[in-house]
Amino acid sequence: VRRGTKPSGIPGSYTVIETPIRSVVCMTSLQLSNFIKMGELDKVVGVTSTRHLFNREMNERLKSGKTAKIGIEGNFDNEVIMSMNPDLILVSPFKRGGYETLKDVGIPLIPHLGYKEMTPLGQAEWVKFVGLLVGQEQKANETFDAIAARYNELKELTAEGKVKKRPVVLSGEMRGGNWYAVGGESFLAQLFKDAG
């Protein structure tokens, strides 16, 4: 509900989130990327891993202490999280977890399932969810529309019949001595296909 308004018709057992939110903890880089796209990094007070973080502004926020590292999934620093007192925590319910202890902190946990999307535009559309949270629905819709238009414009360059020979792509990563390959019906497979 809009911040400062009384919710009506919502059962008492439901958790009410007031928007626009003032602060949030992001558990994945995809969640964080939506705040970057919306120009709302000032609302991100906590993040997990910074291994794949290449955003200069967020790295500066981490160095200055405006945003804190909260640990990794399954091993969160609840004291740090409580000291930040975020309005909510965006979680990935199908990852390693460790959210049981966070539930005891009393901060709403909101599932963000963007990484389960099977298409690049499906993932990009989660910017609309963040737009709702930060009270910028129109900007989020415009942001997504611009992403979709540019994506489809680039995709058209490699449409069937426009590319003589398509490369074969094997993608994945080495982790813990095992090679993890991208599935043929995955987000990345669709991205490679659309790229030609």
What residues fall within each predicted segment?
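Short, solvent-exposed loop/turn and secondary-structure capping segments
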Residues: 35-39, 100-103, 182-184
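Alpha-helical, coiled-coil/dimerization segments enriched in small aliphatic residues
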Residues: 180-196
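Extracellular/periplasmic catalytic domains that process cell-envelope and extracellular macromolecules
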Residues: 17-18, 82-83, 103-104, 161-165, ...
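Extracytoplasmic substrate-binding proteins
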Residues: 77, 88-179
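Flexible loop/hinge segments at secondary-structure junctions
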Residues: 36, 153-156, 187
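A short, structured surface patch at a secondary-structure boundary
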Residues: 1-82, 88-91
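Short, structured coil segments at secondary-structure junctions
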Residues: 40, 105-107, 195
